[in-house]
Design a protein with these regions (language model features):
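Topology signature of small-to-medium multi-pass alpha-helical membrane proteins
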Residues: 1-154
Length: 154
């Protein structure tokens, strides 16, 4: 029982850390989009080249896409924190599935760019996030899906 509690505590702590990291990284991306900090498509092709090719409107659109993506990521990470902190810590099965779908599926879709777009640039981040999400969720399986917990929900 003691090891089960430790494993479950490890589970929700990992999920909170992953969700918190998403908030912090996305906040940095949001700041980069709003502040005009040097940015670019690739290390060789930055905002100045985008402006040369497409004008000021293209640069604003590029920065706007970064801001939009960052705000969505912050929103879903804050929701993941709330789901982890309250229902998941109570051992509610739906919360486990919700976290798997929201955190896991989003990273799988991000990894799909390797096949769909034939690019591996930026794959490390979703791969690491997916690995830690799966680690956190797998550590919670014994607590969330035990017979005792299933009987109390049924």
């Amino acid at each position: 029982m003691k090891s089960s509690n430790l494993l479950f505590t490890t589970s929700w702590v990992i999920l909170l850390i992953v969700s918190g990291a998403i908030v912090l990284i996305s906040a940095g991306s949001l700041w980069r989009g709003y502040s005009g900090t040097p940015d670019g498509l690739t290390p060789e092709y930055g905002l100045s080249q985008i402006e040369e090719q497409g004008g000021a409107l293209a640069t604003k659109a590029f920065r706007g896409r970064r801001v939009t993506a960052a705000t969505w990521a912050i929103g879903y990470a804050l929701l993941a924190i709330a789901v982890t902190w309250i229902p998941y810590r109570r051992g509610e099965r739906w919360a486990w599935w919700a976290l798997l779908i929201s955190l896991g599926l989003s990273q799988l879709l991000s990894l799909a760019r390797a096949l769909a777009l034939a690019t591996t640039v930026g794959l490390a981040t979703p791969a690491l996030l997916l690995a830690f999400v799966l680690l956190g969720l797998l550590a919670g399986v014994p607590r969330v899906f035990t017979r005792l917990n299933l009987k109390s929900e049924g």
